[in-house]
Amino acid sequence: MDPAWDGSQGSRPGTASIRVRELSWQGLNNPQPQNKRLGSHGDIYRERRVEEHLSPARLQALAQVDDLQLVRVLEMCVDTRKNSLGNFGMHLPNLIQLKLNHSCLGSLRDLGTSLGQLQVLWLARCGLTDLDGIGSFLALKELYVSYNNISDLSPLCLLEQLEVLDLEGNNVEDLGQMRYLQLCPRLTTLTLEGNLVCLKPDPGPSNKAPQDYNYRAEVKKLIPQLHILDEVPTTCTNLPAPQKLSQDWLMVKEAIKEGNVLDILLPRLECSHGATIRKFDPTLPVPETQPWALSLLVPEGPLPEGLLSENPAAEDHASNLTHGPGQVLCGNPTKGLRERRNQYQEWAPLEQLPPHRPDLAIRPSTLRPDPAESCDLSMTGLRAWREPGLRPLLQRQLEFQQERLTHVQAQDPQKAPIEQEDQTGPKTSLTPLRLASELSRTSGFHLIPSPPKYPMPPESGISSLGRSADLPFRGRRLRVLGSLGPSLGEGSVLGERLALRALEVSSDPSHRAQGCPDPKPSLGPATCPLGLHCLHHLNPIPPAHPFP
C-alpha cells in the first residue's frame, strides 16, 4: 500500500490490489457459535469427534466432579492413534493414580509432561515397545507394564522413587538389562516371569537354558536391594527353573497381550475408589456369533431332510449362491444365478417346495413323470379342469393363447398356422387336457385323482398292450355316449374327439414324443370350452370282462 495516500483525497488509484467493503447490517460481524453444555453420554460421544484433546469439561464428565482438583484416581481407556490426550495433567494437579490398561499408546510421551505428581501408573496390554518418556514421572512409585513388548529398561534408571515394577510377559532377553535397575535404590518388588531372561542370560537361537543357570540368583546379585522376585522372596534361590519355553506358553502369552476384547466384555470384579471408569474412545467389537440352527427358526417342527445338506460341516464356510469353493462362477453372475435357479426348479425334488394349494389333496412327485403314469396324468388334468379354483387360471391361459393367435393371424393369415406349429411344436396343443397337465407340471405337484369305483389289478409289463387293445372298445362307447341326448347338439362330435384324443395320449405316449404329426389338426381355443362341457356327462366304463 502507498503510505502517502490519504483517504480524503478521493478514491484509491487503480494500482490497488486490496479492497475492503463494510457490510451494512446490524449485529456482530463475526459472531461466535453458541457453546452447547455437556449433558448426556450421547452428547459426550458426539462432541468427542470435534474435540482433539481432553478438555476440562470432558475431564469433569469422566470424573463426574465439578472441581478437578479433587480428582486423585482416574481410569480410562484411550487410543492415541485417533485422539490426542494433550497436556491433560495440568488440569489434574492432585492426580495420584492413573490406570490406562487395554489402551493403545504409541509412546509414553503421549501422556504429556504434567503428571509429575503421579505415583501409581497401570499400562498393562497397551502395545508399548519402549519406555521412552518415563522420566517425566519423577514421583512414580509403582509401575505396572505387564504384557507389552518392552525389551529396553534403560529409561527406568531415572526413577529414584520406584518401589514396584511389573514386567511380566515382555521381551526382556538380556540379563545385562538388570543393571539399569541398580540405579533405582528403593526398588523392592520385581516381576520378570514370562521373559526370556528367565531361561537364558543372553539372547540366542536356542531356547534351552544352560544347566547351571539360575536367574533368581543372578538377579539377586545384580539388584541387591530387591526383596521379592516373582512373588517369592529373593532368599529362595533354589527354586527349579523351567528348562524350555514351550510353544503353548508363547501362544498363551501372545493371546493375553491381544485379549483386550475379552476383558472389555467381561464384567469388572473390582473398581478402585475415586473416579468412575470411563472410556474415552470405546471400540467394542461385536463378537461373531454362530448362526442359529434351522430347527430353531421353524416353530412348526423339524425341517425336511431335503433342506439339510448331507455334510453341513463341509459347506458351513461357503454360501449357497457361490456354489462353494470348488467351482468358479465366470461371466455375468446375474445370468448365471438365473440359469441356476431355473435348473434347480426343474431338477430339485418337490419336498423342498412349499404347498401351493392347502385345500387340495396333493402328493409330491418328480417333475418328469414316467410314461406308465401318463394315464393318471390325463385323468388328473380332466379333474383339475373341473376344480372350480383352477378354472380362472386355465381360462386366462386360453385367452392369452387366443389373443396371441389372433395377433399372428392379423399380421399374416397364411403363415400364421405354420409358424405357430414350428415354434410351439406338437407339445403345445391348445386342448384343455394339455393345459391342465401343464398347470400341474408348473405348480410342482400332481393332484391325486379320485379312486375308481371298481377295483383294478396292479399294473404289469403288459399294461400298455392292454390299453391299446381296449382303445377301440372305449372309442365305440364314447361315440355312443356322445350321440345320446339332444341337449348335447353340435358339441357331441367335439366331445367325442376330445375324449378319443385323451385316450390316444394315455395309451401311447411315445407317439407324440417321437415327433409324429397328429392325424387331425389341433382344435382352436374358441371351441375348447364347448367340448369340455360334454365331458361332464362321461361316466366310468365298467370292464367288459372280469380280470383274472
From Swiss-Prot:
Record key words, sorted: Cell projection, Cilium, Cilium biogenesis/degradation, Leucine-rich repeat, Repeat
Function: Required for the assembly of dynein arms.
Similarity comment text for this entry: Belongs to the LRRC56 family.
Record-level GO cellular component terms: cilium
Location(s), subcellular: Cell projection, Cilium
Pfam family, one: LRR_4
Residue span, LRRCT domain: 207-249
GO biological process per UniProt: cell projection organization
PANTHER family named in the record: LEUCINE-RICH REPEAT-CONTAINING PROTEIN 56 (PTHR22708:SF0)
Organism from which the protein derives: Rattus norvegicus (Rat)
Principal subcellular localisation of the protein: other
The UniProt record lists the keyword Repeat: yes
Quaternary structure and interacting proteins, as annotated: Interacts with IFT88.
InterPro entries from the UniProt entry: Leu-rich_rpt, Leu-rich_rpt_4, LRR_dom_sf, LRRC56
Region (Disordered): 405-433
Name of the protein in its database record: Leucine-rich repeat-containing protein 56
LRR repeat positions: 94-115, 117-138, 139-160, 161-182, 186-206
Coiled coil segments of this chain: none
